[in-house]
From Swiss-Prot:
UniProt keyword annotations, A-Z: Cell projection, Cilium, Coiled coil, Cytoplasm, Cytoskeleton
Record's GO cellular component terms: ciliary basal body; cilium; Golgi apparatus; intraciliary transport particle B; microtubule organizing center
Family: Belongs to the IFT57 family.
GO biological process terms, semicolon-separated: apoptotic process; cilium assembly; intraciliary transport; non-motile cilium assembly; regulation of apoptotic process
Organism from which the protein derives: Drosophila melanogaster (Fruit fly)
Protein name in UniProt: Intraflagellar transport protein 57 homolog
Residue ranges the record marks as coiled coil: 252-380
Gene from which the chain derives: IFT57
InterPro entries in the cross-refs: Intra-flagellar_transport_57
Compartments where located: Cytoplasm, Cytoskeleton, Cilium basal body
């Protein structure tokens, strides 16, 4: 029991720290300078109380620490989601040591991204950042609310003096010494009711005081007078909505209603709990029975599933091989078609007589060209021989002239 109380107190302390941390971050305008810049969602009030998503919470924790360190004027590399958590935690502890914050925990405590250690670190950094930013705090101002008399407050504020009549009747049985005190009390009550009588246009009570004093001596007349004015004796108390007495009375009323309704609700909840428990036990027993009956079939299904997977894998392999062979076959067939077209084209060209005629024309042309070339060669040889003969004759003439001067 004591351990449960301690856990509850610790949980309440963490909730308070988380709420206080969020308020400080709002004072530092983290929604504009941090969330909007990195396109992040706003934090809930108890985001760092319990670890629900350690990866995301650790990244958010390191990002807020980095932002607060910037506010404090400390240099720290902005953490990324893929960074080593141990390195980032070590850097945070190093910065805590630089600002003289005692560190009595291991770095791996920060890797969870939530819990009392992370809350303490963020609380210290946010407090220091608020001091550096010189955030001003103002005294809480409670706006004056309009005075009103609600239904509930009217019932409690309007005092109908029925109890006073009973008390006066009981006091009438006492000795005569108490009569003077009762008369004095009655004068005070008449004095309280005096403004209402004046406002209604009744006779002024000051003029009737001697008559009332005379009638006070008679006990019976005193009671008749009391019965006459008793319905008009109402005291209105101005109620304040912030009065702690009103809150206590409301709390007591609510507590009474809760206690009255809790018995019925508790009985119904116990009945539902017993029904749910019985149904769950039936479902569990039925599940066990079905598992025992279906166990051989499940085992057979597993074996057939494995065999089916093997066959499907082999089928996929054969299908891939068939696709490859089909592609190769298509290529061979295309090549065959090309060869066939080329052979048909060549056969058609060979069977046609135009090629033979072209060959004959080419041969005849070659013969003409050969005869022309032979003629040109003969002419060249003749010209060459003639030139040689002319030179020989000129040489002989020159020799003869030299011998016969």
């Amino acid at each position: 029991m004591q351990q449960d109380d301690e856990q509850e107190k610790s949980q309440q302390l963490q909730n308070f720290q988380s709420d206080d941390l969020l308020e400080k971050l709002k004072l530092l305008n983290y929604e504009k300078h941090l969330l909007k810049e990195f396109k992040l969602k706003p934090l809930s009030r108890f985001y760092f109380v319990k670890a629900t998503n350690p990866g995301e919470q650790f990244y958010m924790f390191t990002l807020i620490c980095w932002w607060l360190c910037k506010k404090l004027g400390k240099d720290m590399e902005r953490p990324q989601e893929y960074d080593d958590p141990n390195t980032v935690a070590a850097n945070i502890i190093k910065l805590l040591g630089e600002i003289d914050v005692p560190v009595d925990f291991q770095p791996n405590k920060l890797i969870r991204g939530a819990g009392p250690i992370c809350l303490s670190v963020l609380e210290v950094l946010s407090t220091q950042a608020c001091k550096v930013a010189q955030v001003g705090y103002q005294k809480l101002h409670i706006a004056q609310e309009e005075e009103f008399l609600g239904d509930y407050l009217e019932d409690n504020a309007e005092i109908i003096l029925e109890k006073l009549e009973d008390e006066q009747n009981a006091a009438a049985l006492s000795d005569d010494s108490d009569m003077e005190l009762e008369a004095h009390n009655f004068r005070q009550l008449n004095w309280l009711n005096r403004p209402q009588k004046k406002s209604n246009g009744d006779v002024n009570l000051d003029e009737r005081n001697p008559e009332l004093d005379a009638r006070m001596s008679d006990h019976q007349e005193w009671h008749l007078e009391l019965e006459r004015v008793l319905p008009q004796l109402k005291v209105f108390v101005k109620a304040d909505a912030r009065d702690w007495r009103t809150h206590i009375s409301q709390m007591e009323t609510l507590k009474t209603n809760i206690l009255e309704n809790s018995d019925t609700a508790e009985a119904q909840l116990k009945k539902l709990h017993s029904e749910f428990t019985f149904d769950l036990e039936k479902i569990e027993s039925r599940e066990k029975h079905l598992n025992n009956e279906l166990k051989p079939l499940i085992q057979q299904f597993k074996e057939l599933s494995i065999e089916l997977s093997t066959i499907q894998y082999a089928q996929n392999q054969l299908q891939e091989d068939m696709e490859k062979q089909t592609a190769e076959l298509n290529e061979v067939m295309m090549e065959q078609e090309l060869k066939k077209e080329e052979m048909e084209r060549r056969g058609q060209a060979m069977s046609d007589g135009s090629s033979v005629q072209q060959i004959r024309k080419a041969i005849a042309k070659l013969k003409d060209d050969t005869a022309q070339l032979n003629l040109e060669v003969a002419l060249l040889v003749h010209a060459h021989d003639q030139d040689i003969v002319v030179r020989q004759l000129q040489q002989n003439q020159t020799t003869d002239l030299a011998n016969n001067p």
